[in-house]
């Protein structure tokens, strides 16, 4: 009888441990990699994001270099907008296309990704948002063959795998190497 009770108790403990381990893994948050201020000014942790989100940005930038404006538009969220380094707000894929076409016509811009950091942050409503912090070197060649470079930092908000929002900061007039 003692063996039956011991076996039953052992089985119960093993099952309880498995259930607890499975439950623990489901609720575990990814590592904290930094902090950020929410729109409401509250300091919130930044969590490591999904590495698979890097592919979205790589494809998006490749579409820029390929001048594939249809692909760019298809990768944008319905409510897409970007705030440029000069404060100009570009709202919608149509406005983005017009901006890009003019920029490319003037300077034959190409983009080279330097780095991408996927991260997640909780917004003021308690919902997790997916972001990419990115750095790109842009090379521009004007109609006279003069080359200049700009380094762009772009914070990108993703919404269901699409580009929803971007904030651009830049260092301009870098000497081409």
Residue ranges and their predicted role:
Residues 149-177:
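Short beta-strand edge/turn micro-motifs at domain boundaries
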Residues 1-28, 33-34:
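Bacterial Sec-dependent N-terminal signal peptides
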Residues 139-149:
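Short, cysteine-centered beta-strand-loop-beta hairpins and adjacent loop/turn segments enriched
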Residues 70-121, 128-130:
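A solvent-exposed, acidic/Ser-Thr-rich amphipathic alpha-helical stretch
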Residues 127-138:
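A short hydrophobic beta-strand element
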Residues 76, 86, 136-138, 154, ...:
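A mature extracytoplasmic/lumenal domain signature
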Residues 125-128, 147:
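Extracellular/periplasmic catalytic domains that process cell-envelope and extracellular macromolecules
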Residues 22-66, 70, 74:
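Short, low-complexity N-terminal intrinsically disordered segments enriched in polar/charged residues
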């Amino acid at each position: 009888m003692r063996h039956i009770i011991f076996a039953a108790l052992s089985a119960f403990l093993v099952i309880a441990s498995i259930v607890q381990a499975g439950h623990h893994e489901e609720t575990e948050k990814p590592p904290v990699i930094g902090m950020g201020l929410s729109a409401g000014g509250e300091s919130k942790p930044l969590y490591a994001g999904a590495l698979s989100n890097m592919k979205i940005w790589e494809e998006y930038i490749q579409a820029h270099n390929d001048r594939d404006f249809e692909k760019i538009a298809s990768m944008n969220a319905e409510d897409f907008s970007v705030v440029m380094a000069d404060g100009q707000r570009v709202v919608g894929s149509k406005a983005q296309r017009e901006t890009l076409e003019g920029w490319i016509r003037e300077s034959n811009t190409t983009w080279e990704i330097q780095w991408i950091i996927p991260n997640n942050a909780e917004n003021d409503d308690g919902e997790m948002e997916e972001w990419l912090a990115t750095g790109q070197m842009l090379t521009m060649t004007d109609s006279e063959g003069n080359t200049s470079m700009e380094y762009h930092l772009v914070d990108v908000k993703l919404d269901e795998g699409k580009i929803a929002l971007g904030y651009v900061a830049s260092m301009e007039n870098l000497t081409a190497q």
